[in-house]
Amino acid sequence: MVRKKHPPLRNVASEGEGQTLEPTATESKVSGKNKELSADQMSENTDQSDVAELNSKEEHSTHGQEPSSSGKKDLQISGLSEKAGFNYESPSKGGSLVSFPHDEVTDRNMLAFSSPAAGGVCEPLKSPQRAEADDPQDMACTPSGDSLETKEEHKMSPKATEETGPVQSGQANCQGLSPVSVASKNPQVPSDGGVRLSKPKGDLLVNDNPDPAPLSPELQDFKCNICGYGYYGNDPTDLIKHFRKYHLGLHNRTRQDAELDSKILALHNMVQFSHSKDFQKVNRSVLSGVLQDISSSRPALLNGTYDVQVTSGGTFIGIGRKTPDCQGNTKYFRCKFCNFTYMGNSSTELEQHFLQTHPNKIKVSLPSSEGVKPSEKNSNKSIPALRASDSGDVGKWQDKMTVKAGDDTPVGYSVPIKPLDSSRQNGTEATSYYWCKFCSFSCESSSSLKLLEHYGKQHGAVQSGGLNPELNDKLPRGSVINQNDLAKSVEGEPLTKPEKGLSGAKKKDFPSKGAEDNMVTSYNCQFCDFRYSKSHGPDVIVVGPLLRHYQQLHNIHKCTIKHCPFCPRGLCSPEKHLGEITYPFACRKSNCSHCALLLLHLSPGVAGSSRVKHQCHQCSFSTPDVDVLLFHYETVHESQASDVKQEANHLLGSDGQQAVRDSKEHSCTKCDFITQVEEEISRHYRRAHSCYKCRQCSFTAADTQSLLEHFNTVHCQEQEITTANGEEGGHAIPTIKEEPKIDLKVYSLLNPDSKMGETVPESIVKREKLDDKEGLKDKIWTESSTDDLRGVAWRGADILRGSPSYTQASLGLLTPVSSSQEQTKTLRDSPNVEAAHLARPMYGLAVDTKGFLQGAPAGSEKSASLTQQYPASGESKTKDESQSLLRRRRGSGVFCANCLTTKTSLWRKNANGGYVCNACGLYQKLHSTPRPLNIIKQNNGEQIIRRRTRKRLNPEALQAEQLNKQQRGSGEEQVNGSPLERRSEDHLSESHPREIPLPSLSKYEAQGSLTKSHSAQQPVLVSQALDIHKRMQPLHIQIKSPQESTGDPGNSSSVSDGKGSSERGSPIEKYMRPAKHPNYSPPGSPIEKYQYPLFGVPFVHNDFQSEADWLRFWSKYKLSVPGNPHYLSHVPGLPNPCQNYVPYPTFNLPPHFSAVGSDNDIPLDLAIKHSRPGPTANGASKEKTKAPPTVKNEDPLNVVKTEKVDRSTQDELSTKCVHCGIVFLDEVMYALHMSCHGDSGPFQCSICQHLCTDKYDFTTHIQRGLHRNNAQAEKNGKPKE
């Protein structure tokens, strides 16, 4: 249906044709591949006409219908050419891959083909006739166009082994291609390095995407093969997104990469489908074939249908057809040799059937239908090619010959190549196209020598039996690609390339393994000038030093090491070089996050040839498993690891690591991103690849917890090791090794800073901070990160304590805010930090970014005080930190402390250090008062900022409020013990830091302080919640000791420095809100207000209330005590405010309070002086809330204040609201609050007489000023008369 255009990975295509085809080459490749695969697998097309019909039907249906006639292999080239447009052959027999519409010639496809393949391609190129795998001969050759495309694919894929070969004989190419096609497809992908390919593919695919057929709506289980994430549904989109984000490190923004998505789906389905016992083989064939085919023929996935090849003993025995109606599961399995078909999800039955019914096929398949089976083995590879080009082409599967080794072991196949118009490249009519039966190696040659030589070197130790696929699986990725390169013999050592492929990422050009007993191989690093040459035997390669160099110096995991035999540094793109980029050391394990992309883009082979052994350069130890080799180094030669590093460095030049870092050329190992600025590369990793790297070494971690643990265990103990690069050698490596298991996110990709130990210039820090903020906003936070933070937070202090020997400077990460800037700097600079917003919390060194940006003085005193504080105030630090993070994390659970919204274009801090949305922050900034909730309007969740609808309080109130704020600020600093403003008053930090530990709240308050000198190490969300809790204790909390309520015992008595009550315009809040504790997050969110309404602290500083104000209130709201005696009473029996609701009538005035009395008429303050709860007029509280509290006149209420402090003069309960259960430490506050209660009921509003249902409703009503008569409500500020 949709043609996948693969980037011309390797247009080895013939000069002329290759060039023409190149554009199409990708397309043709893809189509060819798809075709080949489908052709192979689905060769069972009935009459071409029938098939064509089926195809068109299937295309329309998007479900690959089972080929109506699987048996018809008759499709001949002629038929194919006729049906050039015919897309889908019945998949029945051969179709190991889905008979995808990919073969179909769609207008799209035609266009694509036409342009590239000259006329031939345009021809019914796409008639993918899948000759049955059984009869390669039957594989009808598709029109020359197809062959050309196929050829191109082959050329490209085989690295155009002999560029000529594939192109020259369309048929031959098709045939040859079939085997190669898969490989080539895979190689192409690998060459991109996976990522690159995926992108181009995505781009190409974007065009193709139109066809994607809707996936089946049926419900099914979707499960991630790597981490087990799963869900039950009918849409794989979430699974794709999950895989892209968490395993490929890709942002979901690149959704246009449909091909990649298809591959991802295929990969998961593949895992489910690959049941064959020869799973590795299958895996290889399936993954390489199916995934690639699928990827190449994305339509199949989109179509919702594709086939999984089932192999047994290396013999292709049938297909598992997956259709949209059973998405995620194989619908049925079908024998390739007969019509045996059954529904199910396991190929076991098919394998048993094959062994019982077609035992003769086991051996025969290799030699007799060698063409078919090898191609089958190649799975998808060879068969698709079978669609030999036009019937006119000489090369046909019928012409296919088996090439045997001296022992009569089938080594591969050849097809005579006749020059095609389009494929004239190397073509001499005498040339034949050869392809290896065990891997993707293919070449064009006049003799079979190259193939035999390849066989001897790559498969000599292995029997030709079909079982080799495993080896093939291993070799193919690298070796196949390299082999193709070999075929191209672009470099003089074609044979070495397979090795390179295997060991190749190293870029060693080794002479062919088998060729010499001893050979000297040159190894060089892709990222720097590190090089070395080693003499070794034909069966081993010495890649240990290079691997260790990559891991230690470049922090590159072995699975991500790329190799291109044709490019000095292996960083080339297949479009530019004939060689394929391979990942010779990739483990390609399904659970390896580093290989997740590779599995999608590379031919799924096994990493490295089993025959190639990796020799230890320090002893005689050798092993085919790179992981084992690395482990060997770590365990046996750990002490020498540094030598290797040094060697690398020497090779690099004396520059060594510095050459890499100092040169400032930082390249991403996951993609082609290169930059001179370390911060940028760090940001790139963080945003694009979601990985965290240790700044001290090459260790990378998937999460911050792991990173912290690593730091604690490795660097805190090895403080003496200060080398920037792989200093830890063994430590780093083991972790790296395990990283694939741990790290779902993806790769460790940074060169450790050579300067890790050095302090980073502040300018950098500042800039980086800004960058970080951006990064954080951009970054999608996962809950795990917060969990990590939580886990890590508490350890920060320990880390600091545990690494005393590190000088702050040397420990870039841990500089405890020596100057907050330095700290930030170092943290930021460290890739870890960059990568993760993590570093700070992790190391417990978080410094308020804001503070730094503003340029906190970096006085040594400050640092000293901080360092001392650290152990004690780790929490406050984390908290600070978490909050600063909060501010910058969107959608991370942060909510506005004022309006509770979680959506905002920008997080701001209010005067109290709490996080507020842009709207509330701007409002407060402009009006110096919290944004009233009643004016908050939202548009699509985003708050709209508009003018206040209510009149502002009288100017006096505003001034008072401002004064309050000022005092509050200073008070907070004092209260917090930690300088409220580190920026402005560093000296405070010295004096108070030690105070911080005192009250539990102090830490938080300190945090709350604008600057938050130290960032608490608590998780962001938790920190905010804590802030809220700390700032406001739950409603039901009874009077707490002053210390508890305020950071400073001294201040506790009075509203913590009288942080004025009027943070918000709502009345009740003013009484209920603990005077702004420094960390007091904005005037709390609505709920917050009721939930933690009262601090045990008086909410209004008595000192701040001017007597005049009180008199005014008093005159306004004169409380008729007789009518409301209960206001003054306290209910002694109710210890818990929650429980203290007593039916209104039951409240009695305590005997010592007379319901009636001159006191009732006395102004509030006077009443208070009389030790009375001071009945205030019902509206007084409201008014007071609005203005007086803010008015800071310190005269009248001093008495109250002292009284409050002493508290001995009055019963505690006397200041407890019997209705709301709120306990006031301040009588005035109590009186004001009580004045809000009306006479008719416990929850009647005295201002508008509205009867509220309960205390919460009442609180909300008062707070928001929801008075029935708005005019009256506005008047509330004025004497109510």
Curated annotation (Swiss-Prot):
<dbReference type="GO" id="GO:0043565">
    <property type="term" value="F:sequence-specific DNA binding"/>
</dbReference>
<dbReference type="InterPro" id="IPR013087">
    <property type="entry name" value="Znf_C2H2_type"/>
</dbReference>
<feature type="region of interest" description="Disordered">
    <location>
        <begin position="484"/>
        <end position="515"/>
    </location>
</feature>
<feature type="cross-link" description="Glycyl lysine isopeptide (Lys-Gly) (interchain with G-Cter in SUMO2)">
    <location>
        <position position="755"/>
    </location>
</feature>
<feature type="cross-link" description="Glycyl lysine isopeptide (Lys-Gly) (interchain with G-Cter in SUMO2)">
    <location>
        <position position="965"/>
    </location>
</feature>
<feature type="modified residue" description="Phosphoserine">
    <location>
        <position position="1066"/>
    </location>
</feature>
<feature type="cross-link" description="Glycyl lysine isopeptide (Lys-Gly) (interchain with G-Cter in SUMO2)">
    <location>
        <position position="877"/>
    </location>
</feature>
<dbReference type="InterPro" id="IPR000679">
    <property type="entry name" value="Znf_GATA"/>
</dbReference>
<feature type="cross-link" description="Glycyl lysine isopeptide (Lys-Gly) (interchain with G-Cter in SUMO1); alternate">
    <location>
        <position position="1201"/>
    </location>
</feature>
<feature type="zinc finger region" description="C2H2-type 2; atypical">
    <location>
        <begin position="333"/>
        <end position="358"/>
    </location>
</feature>
<feature type="cross-link" description="Glycyl lysine isopeptide (Lys-Gly) (interchain with G-Cter in SUMO2)">
    <location>
        <position position="29"/>
    </location>
</feature>
<feature type="cross-link" description="Glycyl lysine isopeptide (Lys-Gly) (interchain with G-Cter in SUMO2)">
    <location>
        <position position="879"/>
    </location>
</feature>
<feature type="compositionally biased region" description="Basic and acidic residues">
    <location>
        <begin position="488"/>
        <end position="515"/>
    </location>
</feature>
<feature type="cross-link" description="Glycyl lysine isopeptide (Lys-Gly) (interchain with G-Cter in SUMO2)">
    <location>
        <position position="418"/>
    </location>
</feature>
<feature type="region of interest" description="Transcriptional repressor domain">
    <location>
        <begin position="1163"/>
        <end position="1281"/>
    </location>
</feature>
<feature type="modified residue" description="Phosphoserine">
    <location>
        <position position="216"/>
    </location>
</feature>
<dbReference type="GO" id="GO:0008270">
    <property type="term" value="F:zinc ion binding"/>
</dbReference>
<dbReference type="GO" id="GO:0000122">
    <property type="term" value="P:negative regulation of transcription by RNA polymerase II"/>
</dbReference>
<feature type="compositionally biased region" description="Low complexity">
    <location>
        <begin position="1050"/>
        <end position="1059"/>
    </location>
</feature>
<dbReference type="GO" id="GO:0007178">
    <property type="term" value="P:cell surface receptor protein serine/threonine kinase signaling pathway"/>
</dbReference>
<dbReference type="GO" id="GO:0032330">
    <property type="term" value="P:regulation of chondrocyte differentiation"/>
</dbReference>
<feature type="cross-link" description="Glycyl lysine isopeptide (Lys-Gly) (interchain with G-Cter in SUMO2)">
    <location>
        <position position="457"/>
    </location>
</feature>
<dbReference type="GO" id="GO:0045892">
    <property type="term" value="P:negative regulation of DNA-templated transcription"/>
</dbReference>
<feature type="compositionally biased region" description="Polar residues">
    <location>
        <begin position="1040"/>
        <end position="1049"/>
    </location>
</feature>
<feature type="modified residue" description="Phosphoserine">
    <location>
        <position position="1085"/>
    </location>
</feature>
<feature type="cross-link" description="Glycyl lysine isopeptide (Lys-Gly) (interchain with G-Cter in SUMO2); alternate">
    <location>
        <position position="766"/>
    </location>
</feature>
<feature type="cross-link" description="Glycyl lysine isopeptide (Lys-Gly) (interchain with G-Cter in SUMO2)">
    <location>
        <position position="1003"/>
    </location>
</feature>
<protein>
    <recommendedName>
        <fullName>Zinc finger transcription factor Trps1</fullName>
    </recommendedName>
</protein>
<feature type="cross-link" description="Glycyl lysine isopeptide (Lys-Gly) (interchain with G-Cter in SUMO2)">
    <location>
        <position position="937"/>
    </location>
</feature>
<feature type="cross-link" description="Glycyl lysine isopeptide (Lys-Gly) (interchain with G-Cter in SUMO2)">
    <location>
        <position position="925"/>
    </location>
</feature>
<feature type="cross-link" description="Glycyl lysine isopeptide (Lys-Gly) (interchain with G-Cter in SUMO2)">
    <location>
        <position position="850"/>
    </location>
</feature>
<feature type="region of interest" description="Disordered">
    <location>
        <begin position="116"/>
        <end position="204"/>
    </location>
</feature>
<dbReference type="GO" id="GO:0001942">
    <property type="term" value="P:hair follicle development"/>
</dbReference>
<feature type="zinc finger region" description="C2H2-type 1; atypical">
    <location>
        <begin position="222"/>
        <end position="247"/>
    </location>
</feature>
<feature type="region of interest" description="Disordered">
    <location>
        <begin position="961"/>
        <end position="1000"/>
    </location>
</feature>
<keyword id="KW-0805">Transcription regulation</keyword>
<feature type="zinc finger region" description="C2H2-type 6">
    <location>
        <begin position="1215"/>
        <end position="1237"/>
    </location>
</feature>
<feature type="compositionally biased region" description="Basic and acidic residues">
    <location>
        <begin position="148"/>
        <end position="162"/>
    </location>
</feature>
<feature type="compositionally biased region" description="Basic and acidic residues">
    <location>
        <begin position="1060"/>
        <end position="1072"/>
    </location>
</feature>
<dbReference type="InterPro" id="IPR036236">
    <property type="entry name" value="Znf_C2H2_sf"/>
</dbReference>
<dbReference type="GO" id="GO:1902043">
    <property type="term" value="P:positive regulation of extrinsic apoptotic signaling pathway via death domain receptors"/>
</dbReference>
<feature type="cross-link" description="Glycyl lysine isopeptide (Lys-Gly) (interchain with G-Cter in SUMO2)">
    <location>
        <position position="1070"/>
    </location>
</feature>
